[in-house]
């Protein structure tokens, strides 16, 4: 990268890392490593690359393909995610997270959210929050592609989330930071960085963590992470956590590392801390710390409802919607306006509480609308791993047809049966299409379409 590193950053890294800083600076001017994470719920044959040691489903790629032109990415077969940040899944790999609640406090664009979604399974719940509404829309799109139907996307200040005291089994704060770990990938990260931005970030990180702490149940794990290197936002904030909450923190089981990974460990009190430096690991700059809240008996707090959000479906409509999913007895269907949403029975009550107290952007699975007694399916239903694909035909299409479909262009109707079909590429559903005689109505959402090939 031609743009030089900020001088103050260079000086601070030399003070913090000594001679090792020069190797970091060299690495920050090399090409970033390309990596993805496979969706284990969608058994697609994609990318047989080198495995990422700390990520069961992570893969390195030898070069960066045009991901936009891969229909399987649009179908949620994998998520494009740099390797270092996938380590949060490794920190939770020994936890029995099925049916548990996870809060991803600063979730957009959703890479870590989809890790947590995978870990808790279809009977678990992930609340993915971001304070920026436009970012939550992108977050919701990525959650829909991943297709597990177990995420609630919210757009709230941390203080609003904090009202759900002792609610979550895992609380993850991937905090807004000065972004030093992005210096290799993004030129604007270098231009926007200033010493004062670090001060602003530290203050904001502490505010968010104070609210996040309230939501963590006794015995639950707290994960704090940044994509920056400096010890003020990383170790400094962890030391603050120990000062504020140390009496109620304890260490988790020691996290075992392979020396070949190059991860730098530096524990602080109850926290196990991990630094990822791009001159040591195959990944970008990242920091994460983990500890457990002491297991004292404190009752869960459910905020009082502010409003009613859901309406009940008529029995005949429930019957119509139910046959579109593979486990209808395990799901509850509710109305928001004229849109039917599906939720696993294990979490539907929790989602009702959340929806009545928070600003929910998306939740569960948007199934569609009832029109003349029939479900007109919505796009997320096609991507849902629990979609009953025997209800309508599933048609495997060519790459050219798949790309035309994703552009909302016309494709040959002769390959589809009359009525609604699922369009599939590489064994992965990418959306619905409706054949009407000799033509097809492309049902791919306009706001998701590929603009340029």
PLM features: residue spans?
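C-terminal catalytic and target-recognition region of SAM-dependent MTase-like enzymes
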Residues: 228-342, 347-348, 431
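Conserved class I S-adenosyl-L-methionine
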Residues: 98-108
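Mobile active-site "lid"/loop adjacent to the S-adenosyl-L-methionine
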Residues: 134, 169-210, 227-235, 256, ...
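Conserved SAM-binding loop of SAM-dependent methyltransferases across substrates and taxa
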Residues: 109-122
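A short acidic, Gly/Pro-enriched loop at the edge of an enzyme's catalytic core
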Residues: 97-100, 160-172
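S-adenosyl-L-methionine
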Residues: 129-166
């Amino acid at each position: 990268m031609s743009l030089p590193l900020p001088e103050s950053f260079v000086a601070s890294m030399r003070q913090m890392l000594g001679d090792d800083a020069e190797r970091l600076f060299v690495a920050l001017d090399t090409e970033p490593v390309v990596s993805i994470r496979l969706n284990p719920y969608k058994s697609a044959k994609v990318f047989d690359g080198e495995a990422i040691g700390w990520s069961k489903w992570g893969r390195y790629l030898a070069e960066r393909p045009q991901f936009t032109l891969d229909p399987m990415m649009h179908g949620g077969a994998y998520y494009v995610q740099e390797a270092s940040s996938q380590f949060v899944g490794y920190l939770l790999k020994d936890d029995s997270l099925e049916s548990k609640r996870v809060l991803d406090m600063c979730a957009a664009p959703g890479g870590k959210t989809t890790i947590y979604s995978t870990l808790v399974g279809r009977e678990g719940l992930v609340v993915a929050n971001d304070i920026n509404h436009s970012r939550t829309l992108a977050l919701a799109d990525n959650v829909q592609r991943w297709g597990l139907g177990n995420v609630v996307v919210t757009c709230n200040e941390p203080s609003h989330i904090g009202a759900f005291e002792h609610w979550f089994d895992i609380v993850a704060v991937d905090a807004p930071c000065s972004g030093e770990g992005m210096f290799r990938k993004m030129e604007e990260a270098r231009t926007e960085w200033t010493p004062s931005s670090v001060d602003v970030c530290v203050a904001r990180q502490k505010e968010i963590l104070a609210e996040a702490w309230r939501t963590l149940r006794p015995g639950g794990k707290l994960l704090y992470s940044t994509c920056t290197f400096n010890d003020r936002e990383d170790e400094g904030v962890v030391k603050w956590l120990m000062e504020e909450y140390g009496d109620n923190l304890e260490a988790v089981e020691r996290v075992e590392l392979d020396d070949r990974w190059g991860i730098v460990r530096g524990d602080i009190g109850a926290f196990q801390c991990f630094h990822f430096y791009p001159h040591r690991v195959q990944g970008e700059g990242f920091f994460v710390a983990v500890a457990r809240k002491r297991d004292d008996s404190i009752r869960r707090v459910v905020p009082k409802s502010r409003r009613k959000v859901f309406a009940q479906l008529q029995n005949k409509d429930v019957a119509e919607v139910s046959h579109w999913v593979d486990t209808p007895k395990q799901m509850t269907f509710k109305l928001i306006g004229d849109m039917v949403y599906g939720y696993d029975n294990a979490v539907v009550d929790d989602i009702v509480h959340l929806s009545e107290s928070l600003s929910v952007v998306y939740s569960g699975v948007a199934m569609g609308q009832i029109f003349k007694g029939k479900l007109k399916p919505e796009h997320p239903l096609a991507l849902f791993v629990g979609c009953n694909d025997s209800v309508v035909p599933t048609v495997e299409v060519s790459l050219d047809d798949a790309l035309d479909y994703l552009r909302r262009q016309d494709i040959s109707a002769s390959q589809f049966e009359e009525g609604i079909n699922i369009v599939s590429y590489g064994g992965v559903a990418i959306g619905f299409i409706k054949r009407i005689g000799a033509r097809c109505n492309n049902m791919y959402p306009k706001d998701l379409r590929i603009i340029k090939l």
